[in-house]
Amino acid sequence: MAPITVGDVVPDGTISFFDENDQLQTVSVHSIAAGKKVILFGVPGAFTPTCSMSHVPGFIGKAEELKSKGIDEIICFSVNDPFVMKAWGKTYQENKHVKFVADGSGEYTHLLGLELDLKDKGLGIRSRRFALLLDNLKVTVANVENGGEFTVSSAEDILKAL
């Protein structure tokens, strides 16, 4: 499947997360992104070094600035189960705006065309590192990394595009 690109409508599919009442929710991407400006940024795995030390902290640190520029939702996305994503999210005590969601089976990652084969590292099929800016479901920015790079998908890169 070809990777999602600028101008595409983000595919519908389901993601899972724990809500503020600690209840597991499984919702469609369209239900949380329709009519909104949403940043969906993907990482190869929870608790992995680049994701944990650079990618996620960048979005947490810039969340207020992103919100001030009209962003309604900031979503961190990974092919992990929702329990792992919940635990990972709790490690960022300063986080007030980034929602940690799971694509447990990798099905949504496949719909996006952003799969990354990390079987040789014992991680299976994961998500490429990326940052998408969605405006009422339409992709207006698609910053997708190659391999394990972290050069175009930061919060700063999204801010430059706003």
Swiss-Prot record:
Disulfide bonds: none annotated. Gene3D superfamilies: Glutaredoxin (3.40.30.10). One of its GO terms (molecular function) is thioredoxin peroxidase activity. The active site is a conserved redox-active cysteine residue, the peroxidatic cysteine (C(P)), which makes the nucleophilic attack on the peroxide substrate. The peroxide oxidizes the C(P)-SH to cysteine sulfenic acid (C(P)-SOH), which then reacts with another cysteine residue, the resolving cysteine (C(R)), to form a disulfide bridge. The disulfide is subsequently reduced by an appropriate electron donor to complete the catalytic cycle. In this 1-Cys peroxiredoxin, no C(R) is present and C(P) instead forms a disulfide with a cysteine from another protein or with a small thiol molecule. The active site is at C51 (cysteine sulfenic acid (-soh) intermediate). Its main location: cytoplasm. Residues 4-162 form the Thioredoxin domain. GO terms for biological process: cellular response to oxidative stress. One of its GO terms (cellular component) is plasma membrane. The gene is PRXIID. It is found in: Cytoplasm. Monomer. Exclusively expressed in buds and flowers. Also detected in pollen. It catalyses: [glutaredoxin]-dithiol + a hydroperoxide = [glutaredoxin]-disulfide + an alcohol + H2O. It comes from the Eukaryota. The keyword ATP-binding does not apply. Thiol-specific peroxidase that catalyzes the reduction of hydrogen peroxide and organic hydroperoxides to water and alcohols, respectively. Plays a role in cell protection against oxidative stress by detoxifying peroxides. May be involved in intracellular redox signaling. Its EC number is 1.11.1.25. This is Peroxiredoxin-2D. Belongs to the peroxiredoxin family. Prx5 subfamily. Keywords: Antioxidant, Cytoplasm, Oxidoreductase, Peroxidase, Redox-active center. InterPro entries: PRX5-like, Redoxin, Thioredoxin-like_sf, Thioredoxin_domain.
